[in-house]
A protein has these predicted regions:
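Metal-dependent phosphoester/phosphodiester hydrolase catalytic core
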Residues: 1-223
Length: 223
């Protein structure tokens, strides 16, 4: 296992592996159109990066793709009723559907979260980073929505269920951020220090964003 050097130690260089949008279910095709890359493809990308012996890795958001558009399950093929029916039935059978009237951590909703996270995070990463420290930071899709702004739907700022679903998923599957403003393990903000060679802040800029007037913000003090 690899650990970090003392924050005040002299370090000549640091190598960082960084990537984004690794989430999504197992890749599939419909009518020749590809939806997501196969897990094996993504794992080959990981292997290529790890072969360069990085000192640590940062996974920048979109650890999952499960956009609900305010509903209980993804509205796949919403413009085609037949596709929506068949894919919706398949998703409900394999993964289950959320009950938004309950907390995201309820027994029913937690089962759905685990079905999603086991495929898109646990099965993807496995133990590949066991010897390389890795940090997760969330983005819009980790709140179970794309950052859409349409006439009939504006997905952000995230609603209470989306925030709760993110928190539950992060607590189940994310490695914690340990160097935080209040010294408590966090999921949305943290500092990375690698000796005296590197110091950087990583923060969630999606989940707590607000819109309008001079008080609009991206990063909440509550993080």
């Amino acid at each position: 296992l690899k650990t970090f050097p003392d924050p005040d130690s002299e370090v000549e260089s640091v190598s960082i592996m960084s990537f984004t949008c690794a989430g999504g279910p197992e890749g599939f095709k419909i009518s020749g159109k590809e939806f997501f890359k196969p897990l094996k493809f993504r794992q080959k990308v990981f292997a290529e990066g790890l072969s360069m012996n990085p000192d640590f890795a940062i996974s920048i958001g979109d650890h999952i793709y499960w956009d609900l558009r305010g509903e209980n399950a993804p509205q796949v093929g919403r413009k085609n009723k037949l596709i929506k029916f068949f894919l919706g039935s398949y998703i409900g059978l394999v993964y289950g559907s959320f009950n938004r009237s309950e907390e995201a951590g309820s027994s029913k909703n937690e089962k759905v979260l685990k079905n999603i996270g086991n495929e898109q995070i646990a099965s993807l990463y496995g133990t590949k980073f066991k010897s390389t420290p890795i940090f997760f930071i969330p983005d819009d899709h980790d709140y179970f929505e794309n950052d859409d702004a349409e006439e009939k739907l504006v997905t952000f700022p995230a609603d209470d269920f989306s925030k709760d679903a993110f928190k539950q998923m992060a607590d189940l599957f994310y490695p914690p951020l340990l160097d935080t403003p209040d010294g408590q393990p966090k999921r949305k903000i943290g500092r990375i220090r690698y000796g005296n060679a590197f110091e950087g802040l990583i923060a969630d800029c999606a989940g707590d964003m607000t819109l309008g007037d001079k008080k609009a913000l991206l990063i909440s003090k509550k993080n």
